[in-house]
């Protein structure tokens, strides 16, 4: 019964907020607010604009390193486990691998898209 009351309350509150959002007037409707923004590019222009391949490679490299760093996020909870030596060793090895990958990208000039 308690679950049903909670679900009913949540549904009613959500419906009430949606109805209020539809009834409230849209003030300050500027053309800049209603037009789409595409990272500085004109969204209504040609889709065949030249694109820097070096910038694309830097963006992909950033995504890879960002995802690998995300593997370290559960580390504070993993340290509380019984076998902390193995956890710290594996996380240290991951950091070393990331540093080697970053050094390789730097030496290969993969982080420069201006040239």
Curated annotation (Swiss-Prot):
Core subunit of the mitochondrial membrane respiratory chain NADH dehydrogenase (Complex I) which catalyzes electron transfer from NADH through the respiratory chain, using ubiquinone as an electron acceptor. Essential for the catalytic activity of complex I. PANTHER family: NADH-UBIQUINONE OXIDOREDUCTASE CHAIN 3. The chain crosses the membrane at residues 3-23, 55-75, 86-106. It comes from the Eukaryota. It comes from Mammuthus primigenius. The lineage of its organism: Eukaryota, Metazoa, Chordata, Craniata, Vertebrata. It catalyses: a ubiquinone + NADH + 5 H(+)(in) = a ubiquinol + NAD(+) + 4 H(+)(out). Disulfide bonds: none annotated. GO terms for biological process: mitochondrial electron transport, NADH to ubiquinone. GO terms for cellular component: mitochondrial inner membrane; NADH dehydrogenase complex. It is found in: Mitochondrion inner membrane. InterPro entries: NADH_UbQ/plastoQ_OxRdtase_su3, NDAH_ubi_oxred_su3_sf. Its EC number is 7.1.1.2. Keywords: Electron transport, Extinct organism protein, Membrane, Mitochondrion, Mitochondrion inner membrane, NAD, Respiratory chain, Translocase, Transmembrane, Transmembrane helix, Transport, Ubiquinone. It is a multi-pass membrane protein. This is NADH-ubiquinone oxidoreductase chain 3. Belongs to the complex I subunit 3 family. The gene is MT-ND3. Core subunit of respiratory chain NADH dehydrogenase (Complex I) which is composed of 45 different subunits. Interacts with TMEM186. Interacts with TMEM242. It holds the Pfam family Oxidored_q4. GO terms for molecular function: NADH dehydrogenase (ubiquinone) activity.
């Amino acid at each position: 019964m308690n679950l049903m009351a909670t679900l009913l309350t949540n549904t009613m509150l959500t419906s009430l907020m949606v109805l209020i959002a539809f009834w409230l007037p849209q003030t300050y409707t500027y053309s800049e607010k209603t037009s789409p923004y595409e990272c500085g590019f004109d969204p209504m222009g040609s889709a065949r604009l030249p694109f820097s391949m070096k910038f694309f490679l830097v963006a992909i490299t950033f995504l890879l390193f960002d995802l690998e760093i995300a593997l370290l996020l559960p580390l504070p909870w993993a340290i509380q486990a019984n076998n902390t030596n193995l956890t710290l060793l594996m996380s240290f090895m991951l950091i070393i691998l990331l540093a080697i990958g970053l050094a390789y990208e730097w030496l290969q000039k993969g982080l420069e898209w201006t040239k």
